[in-house]
Amino acid sequence: MARYRGPVEKLERRFGISLALKGERRLAGKCALDKRPYGPGQHGQKRGKISEYGLQLREKQKAKIMYGVSEKQFRALFKEANRQEGNTGENLVRIIEQRLDNVVYRMGFATTRRFARQLVTHGHILVNGKRVDIPSYMVKPGQKIEVKEKSKNNPQVIRAIDLTSQTGIVPWVDVDKEKKFGIFTRFPQREEVVIPIEERLIVELYSK
């Protein structure tokens, strides 16, 4: 399955939860899910019983959509998580949180991961002073993530910083909002990552 590029609010209504796909509307409480907390379509309000496999597949789809990754990318992330020592599910969450587009989002330079990905691919982001335009780049502890000098007055970046000031920044990054840079200080602990994903079900799905 390729990366989803259609109407994102329909996806949130289908899953019945916020996937942080509409940043400014979400923060303002104007998402379609807030007004119509049921699935889209004629039979959207009827949620049938889902099989065990269906639940597992649903969790994988939620994670892929939330982080904006393709099936190929997600499978590669899982293989790496499974290769490492420790809990595979927790490894998966930690690894996917290391993606550059996600770190840009977590630092508050973008209201959505989709916009963060655009900032990266269009060359607006520096890692340790060098331009990196690969969203899947794995950020390591101690690395400095910065909005390029010419892009620091980008209205969308400024707006994102203003909006994310309301919600706070995750504890595994330090951010200087005025200078528009941040440090990825450490790997996040699973309990710190607040996402509506049960990674255990994803591990079960890929382990079949």
UniProtKB/Swiss-Prot annotation:
InterPro entries associated with the record: Ribosomal_uS4, Ribosomal_uS4_bac-type, Ribosomal_uS4_CS, Ribosomal_uS4_N, S4_RNA-bd, S4_RNA-bd_sf
Superkingdom of origin organism: Bacteria
Function summary: One of the primary rRNA binding proteins, it binds directly to 16S rRNA where it nucleates assembly of the body of the 30S subunit.
Family under the similarity heading: Belongs to the universal ribosomal protein uS4 family.
Ranges of residues in domain S4 RNA-binding: 98-161
Organism: Helicobacter hepaticus (strain ATCC 51449 / 3B1)
Annotated keywords: Ribonucleoprotein, Ribosomal protein, RNA-binding, rRNA-binding
The protein's name: Small ribosomal subunit protein uS4
Gene Ontology CC annotation, any one: small ribosomal subunit
Record carries keyword Ribosomal protein: yes
Single GO MF annotation: rRNA binding
Recorded name of the encoding gene: rpsD
GO annotation (BP), single: translation
UniProt keyword annotation of Ribosomal protein present: yes
Subunit structure: Part of the 30S ribosomal subunit. Contacts protein S5. The interaction surface between S4 and S5 is involved in control of translational fidelity.
Pfam families from the UniProt entry: Ribosomal_S4, S4
